[in-house]
Amino acid sequence: MFASAYTLKKKNFVRHISYILGLGVLGTIVAMTVLTLILNYGNELYRDPVTGESWVDPAECMLLAAVLASTDTVAVLTLITADKYLVLNAVLFGEGVVNDAVTILLYQAVDREIQKAEAATNHGIEDGAPGHKDITLGRKEISGMIINFFSLSIRSIIMGALVGLLVSYVLKVFNLNYDPIKETTIMIMFAYLSYLFAEQTALSGIISMFSCGLFMAHYAYWNISKKARVGTEMAVCTIANCNQSFLYIYMGLSAFSIEMEYVHMNMVYTTLIAIFVCRIFSVGVPIFLVWLSTGMKPLQLKWNEWVFVYCGGLIRGAIAFGLGLQMTTDNNKVLKNTVQICALVTIVGVGAPI
């Protein structure tokens, strides 16, 4: 996330901001909504008629939807060049960056509300209420989730911005141009500090680091020597690529650790269908609104390029896999295995043909 923010081509990002924010913000929320509806429908449809048990609790369907709202456009971006497909490249890259940030915030907002609901339910059981009770999120909880989402977003962005401005000021005052290695070290160190500060104050460390990267690229970048500029960019990109490579290797190896006793195949099939269906809405709804807002002018992308956008958004990669591992709900093993299988199927089944 930091590398994406630090190396972001701001001119292209701003020029196509309506498409990027439409797909990255509104599209992600639409995808989560559609996924939640389909998963809840499947959860009730395949409920055991004898025991009355379902795959997971209704609230966990929303948590799973928040995780699977994440997209991974890496496979598509490797096939197109920025020179030949300038708009398409900018839209896909921008959507990927914004989608990652929004997905993480949605996941954290839903997870916090579920933890509160679970705590209240467990407290009721201790007081003598009947055994297991489905965890659901009503209007009050959903309202709290929305407030939490915006509150967490704003505070995390401010935290990252403050750290980014601080390192910019430090580099300007102390003027370390004579030592590019120290400049690069300070840049990377403060980027990680923005993550630590946010995590210690119950904010989103990843969003804080993303915000820090944007401010460092805009301010701190110009307060360091030319050698440090090149070195810092190469360092963060190398670290990011290594991390992503190791994560994909781990994802591949994790296929052998899937616990089949916690896999509901009907749930997996329903989830995969939901991923394909939700992408239609997460692309169609934002683009239709952008088209209306521009006075129904022709779109900047051709129909075949929109097919690339659709296909790129079908893959569930590093963010979805990472968030899936963090789940701590009662049925977390079922959810984790479902995310693992969906990630592997979309990477191999969609990414490989692309």
Language-model segment annotations:
Residues 1-354:
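Transmembrane helical cores of multi-pass secondary ion antiporters/exchangers
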